[in-house]
């Protein structure tokens, strides 16, 4: 089978995008692994298929490089750029992804603004925070993120209890001045550090709101810079007083992930 593909990167998070509007492609886990293999395939953190949807602008099917599925924030931004390239949308889109419906907007240049779904719980686990932004994330605060052993520590946590069975993405976050943070992420499904993780930086931005950071939070990653906008909605008791229940830190809505997405090249692969 000959596969025509487009290679994208979104702040260093790289993907193989496939126009599947005719529904001619479906892949086994072994084929997904081969396509994403950096020695024997195209090489990517994940694969995305853009498909028709009966009521929305398009349907996005995302696979991590190990064949598992999840929401990918950076991938969704790349998908919006790709859908615009294909002429499916004109600047704005509403599409279906792994965790439901999303809105996206192609701004000036290659900047894409993606609306994330609301979050409803942030669990406090010792000094860390756990939050689901379409994929589950653990936020660990460190002092020198550049020198931190992200891969061995991230792998250890990801395969430890209670995360061993389903896995978790582990984000190491350094607080910087000027409402800015630096984030490095060990991603489940890729089972390695990626240069950037969209759902991870979103989770990190929401987490640092508990430490006085305000929207929009600027995020630095090894692959580039992004920003996250959000509104915090405190939990309330029966008298309308704001409270933070044990293990929760409020809810967030109107969450937007903003950053670049670029096509790198296109080609054909014989599977």
Regions found by a protein language model. Name each.
Residues 1-108, 139-242, 247-271:
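A glycine-rich beta-to-alpha transition motif near the start of alpha/beta enzyme domains, typified by
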Residues 114-127, 152-157:
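Active-site glycine-rich loop that binds ribose-phosphate moieties when present
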Residues 111:
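Extracellular structured ligand-interaction cores
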């Amino acid at each position: 089978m000959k596969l025509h593909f487009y290679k994208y990167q979104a702040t260093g998070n790289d993907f193989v995008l496939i126009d599947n509007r005719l529904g001619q492609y479906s892949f086994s886990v072994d084929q997904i692994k081969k396509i994403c293999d950096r020695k024997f395939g195209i090489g990517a953190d994940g694969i995305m298929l853009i498909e028709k949807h009966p009521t929305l602008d398009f349907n996005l099917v995302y696979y991590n490089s190990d064949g598992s599925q999840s929401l990918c924030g950076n991938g969704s931004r790349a998908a919006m750029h790709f859908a615009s390239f294909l002429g499916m949308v004109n600047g704005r889109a509403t599409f279906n992804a792994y965790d439901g419906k999303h809105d996206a907007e192609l701004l000036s240049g290659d900047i894409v603004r993606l609306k994330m779904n609301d979050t409803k719980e942030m669990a406090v686990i010792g000094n860390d925070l756990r939050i689901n932004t379409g994929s589950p994330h653990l936020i660990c605060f460190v002092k020198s993120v550049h020198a931190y052993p992200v891969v061995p520590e991230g792998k250890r946590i990801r395969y430890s209890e209670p995360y061993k069975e389903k896995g978790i993405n582990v984000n190491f976050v350094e607080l910087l001045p000027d409402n800015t943070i630096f984030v490095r992420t060990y991603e489940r499904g890729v089972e390695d550090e990626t240069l950037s993780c969209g759902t991870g930086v979103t989770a990190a931005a929401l987490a640092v709101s508990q430490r006085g950071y305000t929207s929009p939070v600027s995020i630095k990653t090894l692959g580039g810079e992004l920003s996250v906008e959000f509104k915090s909605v405190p939990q309330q008791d029966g008298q309308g007083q704001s409270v933070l229940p044990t293990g929760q830190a409020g809810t967030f809505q109107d969450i937007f992930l903003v950053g670049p997405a670029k096509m790198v090249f296109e080609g054909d692969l014989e599977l």
